[in-house]
């Protein structure tokens, strides 16, 4: 374990009190002095909703919004940093706020509403933070002894139910998600919270990801963690389509975690026609630190451990038998979102928005966001790239080895190249040099000497390694190593991509061509860029507008689509700077990424930037 790589995760972030005058990012922007990222307005993440908009409001329309679009774009994300005179420490702690853009006959209305969680009620009643979150420790309750705190470890309902990350459908109902076992059913038309579900009541898991997969049949799969006699294990949960999806939930596959005291941190998982794909990164939740945090009143981020010298594992599990088929490994990397997975020509392809390490999570602390303009490392810490890993299936016949290409090196160190000068100071972490090594498919400078093998970083400089990837057109590599098959990815595009979306209903788990994302490069010319990536030819189309910060782009297909990108992109928008009482909806042609129409709303209070959402057809 590398000391210092995850240092800020170990801080006791006890309900930080935020000095708005001292840390106001708008002050430097207005002065025009000392801003390292002059095109990026971090304040869009620091806003708090002061007044809900329960009743839909009308906006100003421009352009042409196709009349065939009928439904509601539902959004979820951080709604408020404040409770009384206290402030949360991390973006993931903020109270969940829902947004709704109702679209019908070319017209749009907007409303927002907080998710009515138990956590929100408790905090508002006490007028202080009384439930511990990811980056914020609760105010100690003097009535609770150490024995009470110990007993709470084994009660699922003692943790936060702040479901502020995503929204997914279960049948004709919609639920908000977080990474605890709680979800909330919401009304897609009024945004009212109708019920709370605890997955633990139906299947024995202690948590689950905030990104389940919804099949065309209506069945939902999710990945959870359970405790067994032999230690923690990952479990694939099935919620069969029907009137009792939760009551009928069951486990279809179980995989032991590689470390008994350190289950991996899981934000999502993958699915193909025949396999579940579990990507086990070396970011783990320390069970011993979790107990210490519960007893000592620390925030939950204190439990995370990053093992930089351990590989990332790719597990393929048979969807029929639930058995492990094969495990592959690559150099350590961090990720939140898998773009898509699919099978092709005897391979499983896994596309991931990848980072060299988990430092980007630290970038979302309140203090880090507020001070980003004076942090020369911020852009590097947040830098990631979409990578493609190709996993060869089956055994490799000896006779075919001579026909395969040779692998010259193996490294993930070339994850990205910065869009700023190479003289820029980098992170003091182990991976501060991620910008100088080539990623496969990105050629090194002529005469540049490759670094020698470094076992701690997982690099390989052995000659004559046999490339096991035979998929036509792929630049990804795999080879037989001493511990199994080693993977080396190819880069899909040289943009930082986050919150990726595809034509989900038709291409989830299938061979696809396009995905859509928002830019994660804070040092870009326009950080608020929407990106369309063609993974076949690795080309990009973009849309951006100065000082506009769009949300995750949602693809909505045309009524009778003739191609994968025949449809529109829907994204909400906020503005950087002083205009925090604005929110809008942009509608783009998915083929060309050009604007079709928009609707602008002026609200009665600040509107924060959101995270994830879902288009609910006919929810009008």
Swiss-Prot record:
InterPro entries registered for this protein in UniProt: Carotenoid_Oase
Known cofactor(s): Fe(2+)
Pfam families linked: RPE65 (PF03055)
Gene Ontology molecular functions: beta-carotene 15,15'-dioxygenase activity; carotenoid dioxygenase activity; carotenoid isomerooxygenase activity; metal ion binding; monooxygenase activity
Residues that hold Fe cation according to the record: 211, 267, 337, 612
Tissue: Expression follows organogenesis of the larval Bolwig's organ (BO), which mediates larval photophobic behavior. In the adult, expression is restricted exclusively to the brain. Expressed in both neuronal cells and glia cells. Not active within photoreceptors. Active within neuronal cells within the central nervous system.
Keyword Iron: yes
This protein's name: Carotenoid isomerooxygenase
Region (Disordered): 440-459
Cofactor note (record): Binds 1 Fe(2+) ion per subunit.
Family: Belongs to the carotenoid oxygenase family.
Reaction(s) catalysed (UniProt annotation): all-trans-zeaxanthin + O2 = (3R)-11-cis-3-hydroxyretinal + (3R)-all-trans-3-hydroxyretinal
Substitution effect: residue 477 to A: In ninaB(P315); no effect
Keywords linked to the UniProt accession: Iron, Metal-binding, Monooxygenase, Oxidoreductase
EC number: 1.13.11.65
């Amino acid at each position: 374990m590398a000391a210092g790589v995850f240092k800020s995760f170990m801080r006791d972030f006890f309900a930080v009190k935020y000095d708005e005058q001292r840390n106001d990012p708008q002050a430097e922007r207005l002065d025009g002095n000392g801003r390292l990222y002059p095109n990026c307005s971090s304040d869009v993440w620091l806003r708090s909703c002061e007044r809900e908009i329960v009743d839909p409001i009308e906006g100003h329309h421009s352009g042409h919004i196709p009349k065939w679009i009928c439904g509601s774009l539902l959004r979820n994300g951080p709604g408020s940093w404040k409770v009384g005179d206290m402030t949360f420490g991390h973006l993931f702690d903020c109270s969940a706020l829902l947004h709704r853009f109702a679209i019908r006959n070319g017209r749009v209305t907007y409303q927002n509403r907080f998710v009515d969680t138990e956590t929100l009620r408790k905090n508002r009643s006490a007028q202080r933070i009384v439930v511990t979150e990811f980056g914020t420790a609760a105010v100690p309750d003097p009535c609770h002894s150490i024995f009470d705190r110990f007993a709470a470890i084994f009660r699922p309902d003692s943790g936060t139910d702040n479901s502020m990350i995503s929204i997914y459908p279960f049948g004709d109902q919609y639920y908000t998600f977080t990474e605890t076992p709680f979800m909330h059913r919401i009304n897609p038309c009024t945004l009212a919270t109708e019920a709370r579900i605890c997955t633990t009541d139906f299947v024995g898991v202690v948590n689950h990801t905030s990104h389940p997969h919804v099949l065309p049949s209506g069945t939902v799969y999710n990945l959870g963690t359970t405790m067994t006699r032999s230690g923690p294990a990952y479990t694939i949960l099935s919620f069969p389509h029907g009137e009792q999806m939760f009551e009928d939930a069951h486990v279809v596959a179980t995989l032991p975690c590689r470390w008994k005291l350190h289950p991996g941190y899981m934000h999502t998982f993958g699915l193909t026609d025949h396999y579940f794909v579990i990507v086990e990164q070396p970011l783990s939740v320390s069970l011993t630190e979790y107990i210490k945090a519960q007893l000592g009143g620390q925030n939950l981020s204190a439990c995370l451990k990053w093992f930089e010298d351990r590989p990332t594992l790719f597990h393929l599990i048979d969807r029929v038998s639930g058995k492990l088929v094969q495990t592959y490994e690559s150099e350590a990397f961090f990720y939140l979102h898998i773009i898509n997975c699919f099978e092709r020509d005897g391979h499983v392809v896994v596309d991931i928005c990848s980072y060299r390490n988990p430092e980007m999570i630290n970038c979302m602390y309140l203090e880090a966001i507020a001070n980003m303009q004076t942090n020369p490392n911020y852009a590097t810490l947040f830098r990631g790239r979409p990578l493609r890993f190709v996993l060869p299936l089956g055994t490799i016949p000896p006779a075919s080895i001579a026909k395969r290409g040779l692998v010259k090196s193996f490294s993930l160190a070339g994850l990205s190249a910065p869009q700023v000068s190479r003289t820029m100071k980098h992170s003091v972490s182990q991976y501060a040099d991620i910008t100088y090594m080539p990623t496969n498919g990105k050629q090194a400078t002529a005469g540049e000497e490759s670094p020698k093998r470094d076992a701690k970083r997982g690099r390989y400089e052995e000659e004559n390694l046999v490339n096991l990837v035979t998929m036509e057109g792929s630049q990804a590599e795999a080879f037989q190593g001493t511990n199994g098959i080693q993977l080396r990815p190819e880069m899909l595009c040289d943009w930082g991509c986050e919150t990726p979306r595809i034509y989900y209903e038709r291409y989830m788990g299938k061979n696809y061509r396009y995905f859509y994302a928002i830019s994660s490069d804070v040092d870009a010319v326009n950080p608020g860029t929407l990106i369309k990536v063609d993974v076949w030819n690795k080309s990009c189309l973009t849309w951006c507008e100065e000082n506009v910060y769009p949300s995750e782009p949602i693809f909505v297909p045309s009524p009778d689509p003739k191609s994968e990108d025949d449809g529109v992109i829907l994204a909400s928008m906020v503005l950087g700077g002083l205009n925090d009482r604005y929110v809008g909806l942009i509608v783009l042609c998915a083929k060309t990424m050009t604007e079709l129409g928009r609707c602008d709303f002026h609200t009665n209070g600040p509107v924060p930037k959101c995270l994830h959402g879902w288009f609910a057809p006919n929810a009008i």
